[in-house]
């Protein structure tokens, strides 16, 4: 039995059910916890002191140690303690796992709105514009507790020290700060993900393979967060020249101040981040056949988009084969679900939302 990160610490602060870390460690061990993550704060030298003064028995410690060692024996870690990278890599990109990834993505998509028979799109469409902050970003396909999100956080700290008073130091208890401009995905990160997830395709990349005879154009327009609109005119011009516009919106799911939602991130707003609504209004003013695709780790609510655009597809983070799966949904090779797994509030005033509502 292992703890959540800093769960033992939290018995002291903020929950205040233990007077100090020693008591927190003792109570956790006696309750059946075997390993404390991410570092020993309750399960530290304090355990030795607790045994010596009688607050903890060796039997309690022996039980935790025995369970950990038993698992290691079952896994063969004493005989062969090192991972075999060649075997691990061979497991990553098998046909069966690719098919499962695509199946999971297809089953996760939710058709929120489809008026005037906007979807499915015709495979004979000649010119398609793919715009918005998630149109050609692999990072958008992966959620908080994925390798790409962890890599994003690590690179952010390495490159510019966001979240740290002293760049380069390893700081565990980070006081989260929310700057006016969150970090967008760096080109370096995207190159790394493309190399390590060779079969992963963004929507823009997947469309070019799915419809080789169509003209697929792309312009990002704006970042998911921040106030920079310098690229919006290019995106609007790209959309204006297309027969169909695929408009990606949504936040960024990850760790801390690299993201708008995820681990260590709280929000008082359920609307689109940054200046995405302003962008959406400009896209709508073009009066083009448009499909809105919402990438995110949580449901958002925006009255303008909900009431003005004819087709809205909830994409979430569809994973490694998400781009290919999106093509199948958009062009009628797969029929998406219409059921939400969570309640989406219409406005922030409805929150907290209870199951009884």
Where are each of the predicted segments found?
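C-terminal non-catalytic regions of proteins with extracellular/luminal or membrane-system context
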Residues: 5, 11-12, 18, 43-58, ...
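General structural signal for secondary-structure boundaries
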Residues: 1, 20, 53, 84-85, ...
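Residue-level signal for secondary-structure boundary elements
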Residues: 36-37, 59, 76-80, 116, ...
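Helix-enriched interaction subdomains in cytosolic or periplasmic regions
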Residues: 59, 79-107
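Conserved, charged catalytic cores of large soluble enzymes
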Residues: 44-45, 66, 70-89
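Short acidic/histidine-rich active-site segments
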Residues: 1-14, 18-19, 27, 33-40
């Amino acid at each position: 039995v292992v703890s959540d990160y800093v769960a033992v610490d939290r018995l002291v602060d903020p929950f205040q059910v233990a007077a100090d870390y020693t008591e927190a460690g003792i109570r956790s061990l006696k309750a059946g916890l075997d390993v404390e993550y991410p570092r020993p704060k309750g399960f530290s030298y304090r355990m030795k002191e607790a045994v010596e003064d009688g607050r903890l028995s060796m039997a309690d410690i022996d039980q935790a140690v025995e369970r950990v060692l038993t698992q290691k024996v079952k896994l063969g870690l004493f005989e062969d303690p090192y991972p075999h990278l060649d075997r691990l890599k061979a497991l990553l990109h098998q046909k069966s796992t690719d098919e499962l990834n695509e199946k999971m993505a297809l089953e996760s998509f939710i058709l929120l709105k489809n008026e005037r028979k906007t979807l499915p799109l015709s495979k004979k469409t000649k010119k398609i514009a793919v715009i918005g902050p998630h149109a050609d970003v692999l990072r958008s396909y992966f959620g908080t507790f994925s390798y790409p999100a962890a890599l994003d956080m690590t690179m952010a700290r390495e490159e510019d020290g966001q979240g740290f008073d002293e760049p380069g130091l390893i700081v565990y208890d980070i006081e989260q700060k929310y700057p006016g401009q969150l970090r967008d995905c760096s080109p370096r990160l995207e190159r790394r993900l493309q190399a390590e997830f060779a079969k992963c395709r963004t929507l823009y990349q997947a469309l070019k393979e799915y419809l080789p005879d169509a003209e697929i154009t792309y312009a990002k327009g704006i970042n998911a967060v921040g106030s920079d609109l310098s690229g919006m005119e290019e995106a609007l011009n790209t959309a204006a020249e297309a027969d169909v516009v695929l408009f990606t919106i949504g936040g960024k799911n990850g760790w801390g101040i690299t993201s708008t939602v995820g681990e260590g991130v709280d929000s008082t707003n359920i609307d689109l981040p940054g200046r995405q609504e302003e962008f959406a209004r400009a896209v709508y003013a073009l009066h083009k056949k448009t499909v809105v695709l919402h990438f995110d780790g949580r449901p958002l609510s925006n009255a303008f988009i909900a009431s003005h655009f004819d087709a809205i597809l909830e994409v979430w983070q569809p994973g490694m084969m998400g781009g290919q799966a999106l093509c199948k949904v958009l062009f009628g090779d797969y029929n998406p679900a219409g059921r939400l797994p969570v309640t989406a509030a219409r406005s922030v005033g409805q929150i907290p939302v209870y199951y009884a509502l």
